[in-house]
Structures are given as C-alpha cells and as structure tokens.
C-alpha cells in the first residue's frame, strides 16, 4: 500500500525546507537563495543551495538534494516511508507506517539498523532496571546524590546494567536478534577460547550515546563502586565511531544554529550538567581529540567554536593544541578558562546554575588572548621566546576571518609584548594571507577582496554547449512544464526515442507520470518522481532555465519538428557533408548532396 497522496502533500506543505535544512547546515542568504556547506560531502567552499521559493535544495558538487522528503532520506539514510513518518511527526500529521507497509514486501532491516534497534531496545530495559528494581537502587541513589533528578534521568535515558553476565545477552536472544551481530554492535563480549558470548556492560550506570540523528549507537558505562575503568565505552563498531560522534549534537543542533556558536567540553558528564544549567549549545567528544570529521560537522553549523576544558594543566594543553588546529581550519576560536582544578560539573556544584551561565557569558576570550595569557611569564622573561611567540601570535591573529575580532585581538595581545597595537598590526601584515588566497571554483567563491561571487543558478552547467536539437528539446520541455494542457496537446506529437539528450528523454517520461496524478506542475512535487541525482539535477536545471512565459505563434510546433528530425539526415548535416565534398574536389558527391538538400527544402515548403 502507498501512503495517501493527500497525507504526503499535507506534510510537505507544512514543512518549510529552509527551516529543515537549517537544522543541519549553516545557511547564508545569497540573492534569492540560501547557500552553505553541503551536509553530504566534505567541502570548504559552499556549494549547497536552498530555494525557499521552490522548496528544494541542491548541491553543485555531489548533486544530492530534492524536496523535504528527499533531503530527510539522504541526511538520515532512511527510506521514503520513514522520511514521511519522521516529517509527519515533526508537523503533527499522523502516518501509520505499519498500515502503509502491510501486505507489501518490506525489506529486511540492514545490519546497521538492527544494531541501532538493539541499542534502543536494551535502553528501555536498562532504564527499567535502574528505576524499578532493587538491584538498581544503589546506582539510582548514587545519581541522585550527584544532582540527577528523575526527570533528567528519564530525559537522558540513563539506565543500569545489572551485575549479570547474560542480562543483555538473554534479552536480545529472546527478541530474536542474532547474538553474533550483537557482539559486532558492541553490546556483548566474546570468549575467544570457546566463542561464548557474555554482556560487555555489567554493574554499571549506562549512559546512551546518540548519533547526530538522535539514534542510540553506543553506551558509556560508569562505575559507582570504584571498579576500573571509571568509564567503559562501546568499542568501535560500524555504527559507533568516536571520530564521527559528538555527544549531544542531536539535542544541541538547533541552539548551535540559533546562537551561531558551539561550545566544546571535555566529557559527556560535563555536557549533561551544562545543558541542565541552561547552556544548550554544548557538545563533547568521546575521550578523543577533535577529528577532521568532527570539524566538518561543526563547520556546517557554525564558524564560531568555544573551548571550555578542565581548569588543570592537561586541560590547558588540550585547549592550546585544539584551538591552534581549529584556527588553522578557518574557524573563529574562543576560550572559557575555568578556575584552576575545576571542571564544569564542579563549578555548577559549587556556585550554581545561574553563576555558571553568567560566567560563560562574561568570561570568553579569543584564542589569541587566551594563548598569550598562558604564555605571559615566558614572554616576559625569555627574550628568545618573546620573538618566537610574537611571530606565532601574529600569525594566529592573521588567520582570524573577522576584521573586528582581529582588531580586538590585537588590542588584547599587544600589551603582553610591550608594543603598541599599531606595531603589532604591522607585524601581522607579514603573516596576512594574500588577497588571492580565497578559493574560487565552479561552485562560486571569493574575489580578491574576499567578497562572495554568486555561483551559477542551480544546474545551469548542464546547459553548456547544447546542440540545436538539444536546445529544441530543452525549450519544448520547459513549455510542457508550465502547463498541463500544453503537455496533453503535444505529448503524442513527439516520439520519446527521438530525444537526443537522454536526460531530457527521461524528463519527458517523468512529466507523463507527473501529469497523470497532478494538474499543475510544481518542482517540489516533481522531484519525487525521480530517483537519481543526475535526473533530479536536470529537472532543477530546467526549472531555472529562463524562457518566454507564453510561446510565440508556432513556436512549440517548430520545436516538435526539430525533435522529430532525428532519424532523418538534417539539412545542417548535409550542408556540412557538401562542404567536405567540395574541399576534397569530389564532384559526384557534391552533386549527390545538393540533390538531397533540394529535396529536404521542398519537404519543408
């Protein structure tokens, strides 16, 4: 069974693609459209465009895009039915997936999806064990003494893994899951001598780890009895890879986009407490350095990142190393320096939520200011270090994209070197990126002053160097897209096999399917009828193609005649052959081609 088209239309009409895409991509208005870094492939120059008017999106680079359903399918790697259900939930329109899929050949879930399902099922069991069983009472008390309310425990899905070697094993086995797959998912361990399986997590408080889409892909089990290690995380699996996961990104994404800033903490416990205190744009890595994949995710949401690591030597070293790397990646980097020996959880516990949020708001420095304040003693007493760090800081400031923030950093840093802001600014000139540094490519770029160059309209590169026949096919399709009556009048006038451009041929077929179910053409609806990025790009290209609104007298008939010339030798090609015969001096061929041209001209009269 198919989902009722009226339900699909209602969900699409209630879902604004700009709002949807903005949850995943930082967008900037460029002319009539919005542009940002593509969420589907890694890039440094924005090539992902959203049209609010047409309710479609498209990437110049990887060619992915479409309407709200296709974007959701791609970004979450789910089926069309699942995308409709997800967006339906978003706009409070009910979609019964079970009824939709009944009596149909539903594909068996992939291994990755089954792994996620296992994690989400056992989470419910862990939560029950924590909140409803005698065995979980000690763990629950431990959490409550550390400020975890019942509401927070439920919100975060925190649970308890009993001290049993087969609690999770038996549960998943009863549910019909493959035990070896549960091992590959990281929920079970294996005895390599007899290949028996047992629970990986035992007698631990269980914190679910979610991916960017909010699906549970792993766990961190915390001891509450002093056993080692303090935290036991899921191993690397097909669905849980530390270099790709930022804890709390699924919850923080909207706030990151709204505030245009992401705050990076050291651990997920700090994130939970900071979020509860009111700091909603916080994330953390899972005990690893910030990876290139992490930076790619961050850059698509914001260009401003604030580091708030623990107030100890290790935290300071990590801040310097991470901040330097982020600055090199073109991000605006800020630092919040916690009091010595404190982490966010301890600060909140000592001073309270309000004091913490006020501190975060008022004690934020540029990375350059933080760095020079850490190095100030060495700068003051070591002349060799003075010169070295002056060059380093000059280079750091030169990497800052905002001239306003750059000037602020100059004013903050100059006193540490006993130089005027003007002298420091002069030093920075030697480290400034050249004017032509800014990248430019086929997707748009920057001029010599760093000003943005508008890319071509979506898909227009497809229309370069078209033949005469292809130009006729393009114009013909454009008129058919504008009016259903025009389509019905001319559909049988053209044999689809006469199209020389295969993409245009497929569009012709798509229009037939589309108008069979719709009375008025709409690009946002039409893209649902295609299943390839190339064809989707062709549809979008045609949508952007400028042509007179009303056809001139006999204009469409002329296009039909040109299209139907395929299979027949055209006068244009005969003239070409005549010229070649003349060049080589073949009189017989010249006579033959002249006769053919005369005959063709008579047919057209």
Curated annotation (Swiss-Prot):
<keyword id="KW-0862">Zinc</keyword>
<dbReference type="InterPro" id="IPR006171">
    <property type="entry name" value="TOPRIM_dom"/>
</dbReference>
<dbReference type="Pfam" id="PF13155">
    <property type="entry name" value="Toprim_2"/>
</dbReference>
<dbReference type="InterPro" id="IPR016136">
    <property type="entry name" value="DNA_helicase_N/primase_C"/>
</dbReference>
<protein>
    <recommendedName>
        <fullName>DNA primase</fullName>
        <ecNumber>2.7.7.101</ecNumber>
    </recommendedName>
</protein>
<dbReference type="InterPro" id="IPR002694">
    <property type="entry name" value="Znf_CHC2"/>
</dbReference>
<keyword id="KW-0808">Transferase</keyword>
<dbReference type="Pfam" id="PF01807">
    <property type="entry name" value="Zn_ribbon_DnaG"/>
</dbReference>
<keyword id="KW-0479">Metal-binding</keyword>
<keyword id="KW-0548">Nucleotidyltransferase</keyword>
<keyword id="KW-0240">DNA-directed RNA polymerase</keyword>
<keyword id="KW-0235">DNA replication</keyword>
<dbReference type="InterPro" id="IPR037068">
    <property type="entry name" value="DNA_primase_core_N_sf"/>
</dbReference>
<dbReference type="GO" id="GO:0005524">
    <property type="term" value="F:ATP binding"/>
</dbReference>
<feature type="binding site">
    <location>
        <position position="312"/>
    </location>
    <ligand>
        <name>Mg(2+) 2</name>
    </ligand>
</feature>
<dbReference type="GO" id="GO:0005737">
    <property type="term" value="C:cytoplasm"/>
</dbReference>
<dbReference type="InterPro" id="IPR036977">
    <property type="entry name" value="DNA_primase_Znf_CHC2"/>
</dbReference>
<dbReference type="InterPro" id="IPR050219">
    <property type="entry name" value="DnaG_primase"/>
</dbReference>
<keyword id="KW-0238">DNA-binding</keyword>
<dbReference type="GO" id="GO:0006269">
    <property type="term" value="P:DNA replication, synthesis of primer"/>
</dbReference>
<dbReference type="GO" id="GO:0003677">
    <property type="term" value="F:DNA binding"/>
</dbReference>
<feature type="domain" description="Toprim">
    <location>
        <begin position="260"/>
        <end position="341"/>
    </location>
</feature>
<feature type="binding site">
    <location>
        <position position="310"/>
    </location>
    <ligand>
        <name>Mg(2+) 2</name>
    </ligand>
</feature>
<dbReference type="GO" id="GO:0003678">
    <property type="term" value="F:DNA helicase activity"/>
</dbReference>
<dbReference type="InterPro" id="IPR036185">
    <property type="entry name" value="DNA_heli_DnaB-like_N_sf"/>
</dbReference>
<dbReference type="InterPro" id="IPR006295">
    <property type="entry name" value="DNA_primase_DnaG"/>
</dbReference>
<keyword id="KW-0639">Primosome</keyword>
<dbReference type="InterPro" id="IPR013264">
    <property type="entry name" value="DNAG_N"/>
</dbReference>
<keyword id="KW-0804">Transcription</keyword>
<dbReference type="GO" id="GO:0008270">
    <property type="term" value="F:zinc ion binding"/>
</dbReference>
<feature type="zinc finger region" description="CHC2-type">
    <location>
        <begin position="38"/>
        <end position="62"/>
    </location>
</feature>
<feature type="binding site">
    <location>
        <position position="266"/>
    </location>
    <ligand>
        <name>Mg(2+) 1</name>
    </ligand>
</feature>
<dbReference type="Pfam" id="PF08275">
    <property type="entry name" value="DNAG_N"/>
</dbReference>
<comment type="function">
    <text>RNA polymerase that catalyzes the synthesis of short RNA molecules used as primers for DNA polymerase during DNA replication.</text>
</comment>
<dbReference type="InterPro" id="IPR048453">
    <property type="entry name" value="DnaG_cat_HB"/>
</dbReference>
<dbReference type="GO" id="GO:0003899">
    <property type="term" value="F:DNA-directed RNA polymerase activity"/>
</dbReference>
<feature type="binding site">
    <location>
        <position position="310"/>
    </location>
    <ligand>
        <name>Mg(2+) 1</name>
    </ligand>
</feature>
<comment type="subunit">
    <text>Monomer. Interacts with DnaB.</text>
</comment>
<dbReference type="Pfam" id="PF21650">
    <property type="entry name" value="DnaG_cat_HB"/>
</dbReference>
<dbReference type="GO" id="GO:1990077">
    <property type="term" value="C:primosome complex"/>
</dbReference>
<keyword id="KW-0460">Magnesium</keyword>
<comment type="similarity">
    <text>Belongs to the DnaG primase family.</text>
</comment>
């Amino acid at each position: 069974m198919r989902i009722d088209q009226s339900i699909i239309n209602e969900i699409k009409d209630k879902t604004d693609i700009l709002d949807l895409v903005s949850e995943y991509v930082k967008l900037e208005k460029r002319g009539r459209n919005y542009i940002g870094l593509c969420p589907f492939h890694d890039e440094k120059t924005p090539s992902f465009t959203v049209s609010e008017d047409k309710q479609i999106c498209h990437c110049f680079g990887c060619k992915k895009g479409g309407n709200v359903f296709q974007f959701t399918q791609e970004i979450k790697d789910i089926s069309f039915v699942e995308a409709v259900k997800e967006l339906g939930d978003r706009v409070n329109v009910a979609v019964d997936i079970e009824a939709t899929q009944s009596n149909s050949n539903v594909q068996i879930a992939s291994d990755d999806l089954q792994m996620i399902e296992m994690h989400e099922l056992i989470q419910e069991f862990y939560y029950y064990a924590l909140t409803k069983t005698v065995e979980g009472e000690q763990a629950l008390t431990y959490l409550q003494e550390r400020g975890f309310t019942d509401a927070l425990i439920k919100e975060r899905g925190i649970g308890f893994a009993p001290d049993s070697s087969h609690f999770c094993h038996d549960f998943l086995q009863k549910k019909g899951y493959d035990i070896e797959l549960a091992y590959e998912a990281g929920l079970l361990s294996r005895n390599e001598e007899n290949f028996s399986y047992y629970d990986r997590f035992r007698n631990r408080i269980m914190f679910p780890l979610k991916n960017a889409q909010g699906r549970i892909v792993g766990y961190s089990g915390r001891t509450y009895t002093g056993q080692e290690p303090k935290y036991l995380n899921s191993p690397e699996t097909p669905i849980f890879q530390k270099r790709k996961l930022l804890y709390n990104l699924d919850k923080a994404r909207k706030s990151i986009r709204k505030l245009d800033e992401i705050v990076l903490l050291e651990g997920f416990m700090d994130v939970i407490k900071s979020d509860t205190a009111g700091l909603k744009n916080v994330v953390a890595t899972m005990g690893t350095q910030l990876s290139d994949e992490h930076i790619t995710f961050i850059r698509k949401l914001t260009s401003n990142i604030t580091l708030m690591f623990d107030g100890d030597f290790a935290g300071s070293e990590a801040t310097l190393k991470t901040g330097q790397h982020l600055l090199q990646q073109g991000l605006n980097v800020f630092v919040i320096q916690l009091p010595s020996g404190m982490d966010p959880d301890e600060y909140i516990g000592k001073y309270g939520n309000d004091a913490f949020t006020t501190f975060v708001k008022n004690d934020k420095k540029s990375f350059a200011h933080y760095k020079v304040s850490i190095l100030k003693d060495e700068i003051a007493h070591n002349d060799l270090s003075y010169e070295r760090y002056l060059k380093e800081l000059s280079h750091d400031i030169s990497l800052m994209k905002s001239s306003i923030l750059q000037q602020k950093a100059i004013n903050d840093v100059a006193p540490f070197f006993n130089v005027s802001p003007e002298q420091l600014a002069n030093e920075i000139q030697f480290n400034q990126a050249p004017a032509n540094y800014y990248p430019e490519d086929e997707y748009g770029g920057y001029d010599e002053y760093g000003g943005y160059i508008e890319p071509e309209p979506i898909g227009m590169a497809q229309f370069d160097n078209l033949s005469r026949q292809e130009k006729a096919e393009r114009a013909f399709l454009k008129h058919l897209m504008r009016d259903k009556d025009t389509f019905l009048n001319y559909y049988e006038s053209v044999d689809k096999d006469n199209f020389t451009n295969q993409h245009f041929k497929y569009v012709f077929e798509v229009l037939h399917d589309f108008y069979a179910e719709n009375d008025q053409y709409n690009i946002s609806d039409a893209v649902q009828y295609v299943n390839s990025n190339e064809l989707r790009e062709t549809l979008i290209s045609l949508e952007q193609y400028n042509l007179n609104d009303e056809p001139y007298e006999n204009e469409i008939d002329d296009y039909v005649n040109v299209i139907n010339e395929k299979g027949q030798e055209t006068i244009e090609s005969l003239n070409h052959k005549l010229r070649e015969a003349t060049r080589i001096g073949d009189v017989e061929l010249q006579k033959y081609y002249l006769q053919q041209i005369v005959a063709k001209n008579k047919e057209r009269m």
